[in-house]
Amino acid sequence: LVSSSEALLDANRADLWDSGRINTNESVNIVYEGVPLIAGQKCFWKVRFSDEQGNWSSWSAPASWRMGLLADDWGAQWIGSEKMEAQSVGGRKVNNVMPDPWFRKTFNLETIPQDAVIYVASVGYHELYVNGKKVGDAVLSPSVTDHKSRARYMTYDITNYLQSGNNVIALWLGTSWSIFPAYQREDKPAIPMALVQAEIILPSGKELQITSDESWKTHASPNTLLGYWEAHHFEGECYDAALEKDNWNAIDFDDSDWEQVKVYHPALKVSSDRTEPNRLIQEITPLSIQEITPGVYRVDMGVNYAGWFEMQLKGQPGDSIVFQFSEREKDVCSYGIHSIYKVGPKRKGTFCNRFNYMTGRWVQISGLRYKPTIDQIRGWMIRPDYRRSGGFECDIPLLNNIYRTTLWTLENLSLGNYVVDCPHRERCGYGGDALATTRTALGNYQLGAFYNKWMEDWRDVQEADGNVPYTAPTRIGGGGPSWSGFCITLPWEFYRQYGDIRILSESFPTIQRWLDFLETKSQHNMLVRWGGKWSFLGDWLWPDAWSERSAMEKQGKALGDTRETLFFNNCHWIYSLETAARIADILGHKTVAATYRKRASEIRKAVHTTFFDSRNNSYVNGYPSYLAIALMVDLPPENLRTKVWKRLEQEILVNRKGHFWGGITAGSFLLHTLLDNHRDDLIFEMAMKEDFPGWGNMLEKGNGTLFEDWECRGSALHSSYLYIGSWFIEALGGIRRTESGYKQFIIEPWITEKGPQQVRSHYNSMYGNIESNWAVNSGVLNLEVTVPANTTAILKLSDIDLETLKEGDSIWKEAKGVSLYTQKGKAISLALQSGTYRFSVTMNSGLQ
């Protein structure tokens, strides 16, 4: 039921939509089919369901949503400060000198409103205040977006903030992304701007609208961005407490000396920020404070993180206290990340970031007249407020540590509702890096809104000729076809995880145009090198990449010039075409799907003929990652596949001595090829290595996060090798999807003598929580499986004594909800209906 008011919903009167009883097994991704809705409308809904016997559940708790605004619904104008323009000298960027602006608008209400909502779009970050109080607990809002084409607005319910009589709406804007060079255009100056529209309904039914226009007032705030918001120059903030104006956002504040705002007219699409906002997720407590030289203190925050640093301070007016943040214990400052607090006439105050954020573990503080104490300092890890959906734990500490560190690293890369390569140096949403993070992220977090937003960013940045940049929404940085090809990978992986076909239909035009663009870069059924030094990249940051790259540069070559790069990029082209064909099939575009498959077949033949090494049953230099992608895209003919697989095993176990040998992009294909083909023995061998190259080596040298490169030379908080995070629940827990959205799934844990002997894992799907918990003791496997309502599972067990297989106290054949699916030798597959099952069976392998 969907109603226009809570009262109607309570009375079961659905004036907007009553679906009636629908006989279907679909219970997620249900599309609204009721009365057409209007802008700003609030809708209240609830649902109930019946089982196969016709027994009805109780009604769900009431919930609601509010409709957003379309382009024609906006009556507001973009406003900014005429005095705040980005500075440059002779065309060269210089550090920002614009203070972050304050805006105010006062107005009168004849009575307390019945309902009031305000929409705030901004170029750059914003904070909203009504009558002196900050609205909501979101920070660094809105989500990062491509300000060359779009701005996102936040929706705030301010009913309880308003009063009868005088009121004030105030904004604090952050310069931040407003001056990002890639976002500039002639009709949009490099300044923070806001678009504000409040819709107020009084008890009488009278409707009022407060909008941003030339009547608003502005003044410089005490906060100023440091740097100029570009790679290597994100820096921090300077807060000058001498410039504070108490109660600047209060009703009775005297703003008579404030300037009028200036109205601007940027041609930006304005869209709702339909994601979980950034919030203060976790408080970080420092471990220690050390005085390294007289008056200079070094704080160890205990873990590398991205977010805010907060400290209570005191001093003499004019004192400048400098905070420098670093990822490494011996470094004073990493990537120029630093902030400044200038003491004001009150002689005390609190520094905390507001419109920027820091990254690091250590903070070097200078300018104090006293030794600080731990209780004066805290940090805040910030990310969008999405929820965890997956969990894993086993009896091998190294694997638990890799899993936890992978997820902590990922969370610290997601601030702004896109996944960055690193949060300090570049802050770019690289598509190549996303190959390493997406499957891990989807398998461990509820990220429907997050990835829907990021896919919209990728559609936004596509160029007129069909090319897709290597990053979104940031539009800068190097890469190659596997970076741009994320415009295919993302909607496909999203659909597989959530079963929502809409992201496929919305993204398919982008996919088609990009594949058309690739055809313009091909000759004789293969892509050829195009672009400059940082284009046409293949794999990136594999083990020993630094030395190989240095040797090439001495020869005047770039990474895009190598035979291995040409091979990988053409294999990825096949992968892109085959994935696009699957998407086309689902959307009903059968002719298009057939065309893509035919094209992939032509390219496959050309690539195999050009690159296959028949003497070694290998491709190019034989790196495992290149053999893996060849197998994933069916490059070797059927009569050669077994030989190439054996070569891959030899490369891993013998030539690489059991170490992982792949970079960001090709490495993701190595991990996922092995995972999808149940070669968990090989993944386990590589995951357990504690020397170079390996995750264990990173843990030994790191600060609770994973590095940019296997050598641990670059960034210490990076996205490069997070693909390992997809292995734990899928393989060791054995929870694998067979139908999109986990309508049907497999439980097939990897159980072997050399692997874990105890595992607890779960994935909270849209249908409910899936659990796979197992342990082997004295040769007996005990396995607990939970199958959510309206789903089915296939439980696969091998190398067992079938005569001893029980569910609870019953033999499996008599267990309710359990039926035989297939049986072959010592292996059995059972079909499970919804419910919780406890199986026990003797293992033939002699596991202890």
Where are these regions (language model features)?
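Active/binding-pocket-proximal capping segment
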Residues: 126, 134-142, 458-459, 509-514, ...
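C-terminal capping/lid segments that line or modulate ligand- or cofactor-binding pockets
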Residues: 169, 234-235, 239-240, 425-426, ...
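Alpha-helical support elements that line or immediately flank enzyme active sites
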Residues: 116-120, 130, 308-325, 353, ...
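Active-site acid/base region of carbohydrate-active enzymes
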Residues: 124-125, 195, 211-220, 372-405, ...
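Short helix-capping and inter-helix turn/linker motifs at the boundaries of alpha-helical repeat units
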Residues: 97-98, 301, 428-429, 481-482, ...
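Non-catalytic C-terminal accessory modules of carbohydrate-active enzymes
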Residues: 193-197, 211-247, 273-282, 598, ...
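Extracellular/oxidizing-compartment recognition motifs
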Residues: 1-42, 46-424, 432, 449-450, ...
